């Protein structure tokens, strides 16, 4: 993947963006400044994958500019060809916390819809903050649990849509009136 350094984001802008997030919003100015200083900014082209489902990850991302799409491959599809849309990510959204905090492989693929500038925070950048303020992990855990819940709701909604489409197709095939 061709990450391009993005030098048009100032340290103050990075700090402000980090402060606006649910994960890092409760950090003090000094902690935000330290994290902003260590974090890198990259530019990604439209259609480019930022993370791929199944890969290991040791960083999380914050969207500075652009829109991204989250996809999850079904059990019977290839992870290089995401099959199911999950959600959009926009300015101030974060992603990648799950792989960063659990050491598990990425649970979804994230692809740029437009040109995107992202702040990348690596595990090694978080360690000093976690030692100083371990409750950050609780916040991240809450965010991850909420995302899992949303994903489950999306999956249930998708399954219901497929069920209704199948019933409608069967009704057409047998020329039966459709129930309202």
Give the role of each language-model region.
Residues 1-180:
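Cytosolic regulatory regions built on CNB/CRP/Popeye-like sensor folds
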């Amino acid at each position: 993947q061709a990450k391009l350094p993005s030098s048009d984001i100032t340290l103050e802008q990075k700090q402000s963006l980090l402060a606006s997030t649910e994960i890092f919003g409760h950090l003090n100015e000094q902690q935000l400044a330290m994290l902003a200083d260590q974090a890198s900014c990259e530019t990604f082209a439209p259609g480019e994958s930022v993370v791929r489902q199944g890969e290991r990850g040791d960083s999380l991302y914050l969207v500075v500019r652009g829109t991204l799409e989250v996809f999850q491959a079904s059990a019977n599809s290839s992870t290089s060809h995401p099959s199911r849309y999950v959600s959009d990510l926009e300015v101030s959204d974060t992603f990648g916390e799950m792989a960063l905090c659990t050491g598990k492989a990425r649970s979804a693929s994230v692809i740029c819809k437009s040109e995107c500038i992202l702040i990348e925070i690596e595990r090694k950048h978080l360690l000093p903050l976690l030692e100083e303020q371990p409750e950050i992990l609780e916040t991240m855990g809450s965010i991850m649990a909420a995302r899992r819940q949303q994903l489950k709701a999306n999956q249930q909604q998708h399954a219901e849509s497929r069920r209704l489409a199948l019933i409608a197709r069967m009704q057409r095939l047998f020329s039966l009136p459709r129930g309202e």
